[in-house]
Regions:
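N-terminal Sec-pathway targeting helices
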Residues: 1-14
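Solvent-exposed, non-transmembrane regions of membrane-associated and secreted proteins
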Residues: 20-256
């Protein structure tokens, strides 16, 4: 009888070990695959385009930035490229209005992955553009995707990295960080700031109220603010010090 119990326990542990090993192998395979894919995309972006190749028209007034044109032809859900120096944040940014959260669990190649790909909230208009462009990205344990935003919790990092780059398909853009804060979502708690609900300001007061709340919650004073008429960029990722926590970096456009 004891031998049967012992064998059953060994079998159970073996099954658990096999399943756990399978998950780990899958995770590391996915990690390596995603890293290789994005490294290849970065190589395209950082390679000088051929001078003989004419850029495509994006609209009647604008043409594609050549290196982004090539990626757009691979996946026309691409709306831009984001980069933060001294982090792993160097990625295409996607938007799928028909399937808003598609890139939460799909990569640039549209294949399923836990890593996802940074993406713009569906009600943000990249063409106008909206007053506030909100981009989401996962906080991955290997430091990829938007995990690098965690560095902004340290004021000394911000002091050396006061701007982020977010290019559209047609314009190179630089944003200046105005606030970095932690909040919670999916709750009616008074600690919850629904920053993701602010996309367009109907009045000067709406815009000012949003910016003031961001500044009030900021982990430190950047000495920078924004005024009605400025264009904002809000970067959001998970923050694990509390349930449903988020770390948010808000910046304003300073060139286009």
């Amino acid at each position: 009888m004891k031998n049967k119990i012992y064998i059953a326990i060994i079998c159970a542990f073996s099954i658990v070990f096999a399943v756990s090993s399978g998950f780990l192998i899958k995770h590391y395979y996915d990690s390596a695959k995603q890293a290789e894919m994005y490294d290849n995309l970065i190589e395209v972006v950082e390679t000088e385009p051929e001078e003989t190749k004419e850029p495509m028209n994006y609209s009647e007034e604008k043409t594609f930035i050549p290196e982004y044109q090539e990626l757009y032809l691979q996946n026309n859900d691409m709306v831009g490229w984001i980069k933060v120096e001294d982090t792993k944040i160097n990625y295409p940014v996607m938007q799928s209005k028909d399937n808003p959260n598609f890139y939460l669990k799909h990569g640039f190649d549209k294949a399923y992955t836990d890593y996802g790909c940074p993406y713009v909230q569906e009600n943000c208009d990249m063409e106008l553009p909206s007053d506030n462009i909100i981009i989401y990205g996962h906080h991955m344990n290997d430091g990829s995707m938007f995990a690098g935003l965690m560095k902004f919790k340290d004021k000394s990092f911000w002091e050396k990295h006061k701007t982020v780059s977010f290019d559209t398909l047609t314009d190179r853009q630089t944003y200046e960080v105005i606030a970095v804060f932690k909040t919670v979502v999916y709750t009616d708690s008074p600690d919850s700031f629904k920053y993701y609900q602010f996309v367009n300001a109907e009045t000067d007061e709406d815009f000012t109220s949003y910016v003031e709340k961001c500044k009030e919650l900021s982990l430190y004073d950047t000495g920078v603010t924004a005024e009605y008429g400025d264009k904002l960029l809000t970067l959001s990722t998970c923050e694990y010090s509390r349930t449903n926590g988020r770390l948010v970096v808000v910046a304003k456009l300073i060139n286009e």
